[in-house]
Amino acid sequence: MKRSIYLTAIAMTMLFTACTKEEVADVPSSDQTIEFLVNGNPSGGNFTLFSFEKGVAVPTADSNSLKWDFGLRFETFIINSKASGPGNAFVQILNQPYTAVTSAALSGYKFDTTASQKAIKGLEWYTYNSITRQFSPIAGKTFVFVTANGKYAKMEVLKADPANDNGEPVTPPTRPTRIKYTLRYFYQKNGTPNFQ
């Protein structure tokens, strides 16, 4: 009887210890590459909202929430803070290659102060060819975010291609209705500014 109680106590201790370790263990963060379509109209329509935490586009219906970190329309970024949303997101663009950015700075961030004063200015990160309607991301530009919920992420725009509603490439004289973005990012789930 004593042996049975003793073994039960050991088993419960091991189970409790295992559960505790699982609860506090961080899910490893890693580089992700995604493609998604955004509105190709430079002057109107909805922004495509993106969540680093979920790694997916967020419905426009959730624009007044903390479920998204940044939005894109054509080549215009909005950040979920101040003038553009209820979150506490901030961003800065570093003149460093993506792989060289191993941690987030603790200062130097910007937010959308008004509808016309955005944290990210278009020509900071790309050149545009008006004949081919092609955006070319500038090499060595890395976006570093404080997300809407106060965590850290880094991002690089790999491609921004003119496309139709199905995401298929278009060339002049066809006008694109969408821009197909390819992004690489690292979201630090544990809340530290470390990207390694």
Residue spans of the language-model regions?
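C-terminal motif of bacterial Sec signal peptides marking the signal peptidase cleavage site
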Residues: 15-18
